[in-house]
Amino acid sequence: MSHVPLDPETARKVTSSLNYRFEIGGEPLVIAIAQDAENGDVLMTAFANEEAVYRTLTTGYAHYWSTSRREVWKKGEESGHVQRVVEVRVDCDKDAVLYVVEQEGGACHTGYRSCFYRRVTRDGSFEVVMDRVFNPDEVYR
């Protein structure tokens, strides 16, 4: 059963209680992790400021803070590969959030379902362990 979206007042109560201890470019942030609701796979990790968490809680779609563009962005707003949030969890220090999501398409901008598509091998190289689910050259024009 989905626990989001929340009403605005409840969402503000949640966002104001988090510990935005990480700072990039002067922006207070929490770590945001997306996990596949169906199989538990970790899909991606990013950052979220207070507004990104608020939008996630009130819309039911994952929002993050872009450290390069310095703005809140909805996952999939360009690609269509949105993350519908079914649950939000908070870690023990309240400085990280876990978005349990139903992923549409791929989570990674490189075309993979997960950003964790490579594993470290015995010789220290990286081995691709997943197939691409979309062609990024066709999606991001």
Curated annotation (Swiss-Prot):
According to the lineage, what is the superkingdom? Archaea
Q: Which cofactor does it need?
A: Mg(2+); Zn(2+)
Pfam families noted in UniProt: PRA-CH
GO molecular function list: magnesium ion binding; phosphoribosyl-AMP cyclohydrolase activity; zinc ion binding
Please identify the protein, giving its name as recorded: Phosphoribosyl-AMP cyclohydrolase
Self-association or partners: how does it assemble?
Homodimer.
Q: Which PANTHER family match?
A: HISTIDINE BIOSYNTHESIS BIFUNCTIONAL PROTEIN (PTHR42945), HISTIDINE BIOSYNTHESIS BIFUNCTIONAL PROTEIN HIS7 (PTHR42945:SF1)
Q: Which UniProt keywords apply?
A: Amino-acid biosynthesis, Cytoplasm, Histidine biosynthesis, Hydrolase, Magnesium, Metal-binding, Zinc
Show the Gene3D superfamilies listed in the entry. 4.10.80.70, Phosphoribosyl-AMP cyclohydrolase (3.10.20.810)
UniProt lists the family membership as follows: Belongs to the PRA-CH family.
Query: Any S-S bridges, and between which cysteines?
Result: none
- Specify where it is mainly localized: cytoplasm
- What does it do? Catalyzes the hydrolysis of the adenine ring of phosphoribosyl-AMP.
Q: Which GO terms describe its cellular component?
A: cytoplasm
What NCBIfam families has UniProt attached to this entry? PRK00051.1
- Cofactor binding remark: Binds 1 Mg(2+) ion per subunit.
Per the UniProt entry, what species is this protein from, by scientific name?
Methanopyrus kandleri (strain AV19 / DSM 6324 / JCM 9639 / NBRC 100938)
Where in or outside the cell it occurs: the entry states: Cytoplasm
Which reaction does this enzyme catalyse, per its entry?
A: 1-(5-phospho-beta-D-ribosyl)-5'-AMP + H2O = 1-(5-phospho-beta-D-ribosyl)-5-[(5-phospho-beta-D-ribosylamino)methylideneamino]imidazole-4-carboxamide
Question: What is the gene name?
Answer: hisI
Question: What's a BP term from Gene Ontology annotated to this protein?
Answer: L-histidine biosynthetic process
The EC number on file is 3.5.4.19
Pathway this chain belongs to: Amino-acid biosynthesis; L-histidine biosynthesis; L-histidine from 5-phospho-alpha-D-ribose 1-diphosphate: step 3/9
Annotated HAMAP family? HisI
Provide the binding site for Zn(2+).
C92, C108, C115
Which annotated residues bind Mg(2+)? D91, D93, D95
